[in-house]
Regions:
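Intrinsically disordered, low-complexity serine/threonine- and proline-rich regulatory segments
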Residues: 1-27, 101
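Glycine-centered, phosphate/nucleic-acid-interacting loop/turn motifs that mediate DNA/RNA or nucleotide
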Residues: 70
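N-terminal helix-turn-helix DNA-binding core of bacterial DNA-binding proteins
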Residues: 16-60
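Short polar/acidic secondary-structure junctions
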Residues: 51, 77-79
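Basic, amphipathic "hinge/linker" alpha-helix immediately C-terminal to the N-terminal HTH DNA-binding motif
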Residues: 80-102
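Short beta-strand "wing" residues that participate in macromolecule-binding interfaces
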Residues: 74
Length: 127
């Protein structure tokens, strides 16, 4: 590969997609910190509180895996109108995992911010 060329498929969009994919599990747990939500509410919450646009085909496998790991519980609730909804809640283990993930993320992002600050300042992105 010639100096200065990027490997095939190594685009900012692809990199951002990988970053988001890694953050969705923590975001799903965080969305349930305040209480019980059903799947579509989790998706809407993530969209309203962050830049994470998560599709149903992405969130439900994650929720199922987190439930299988004992981090979430779920309960079907009959709706007054329409179909029953599956509501998800954090277990004590899920709350503990979220606290550990949030601490690790905080340390990681602070370190990265320190590294990127001079780059962003030079580009005029930061004052």
């Amino acid at each position: 590969m010639a100096l200065g060329t990027k490997p095939a498929g190594d685009t900012p969009d692809r990199w951002e997609a990988q970053l988001r994919k890694g953050a969705v599990e923590m975001a799903a747990l965080a969305s349930l910190w305040g209480g019980t939500l059903y799947g579509l509410e989790i998706i809407r919450f993530l969209e309203s509180q962050s830049s994470l646009a998560v599709a149903e085909g992405t969130i439900y496998p994650i929720l199922n895996r987190l439930k299988a790991e004992g981090l979430l519980t779920s309960e079907w609730v009959e709706a007054e109108a329409g179909h029953p909804r599956k509501y998800y809640s954090l277990t004590p283990s899920g709350s503990q995992r979220l606290r550990l993930m949030a601490e690790a993320w905080n340390n990681f992002s602070r370190g990265l911010d320190r590294l990127l600050e001079p780059v962003l300042e030079k580009q005029g992105i930061l004052p």
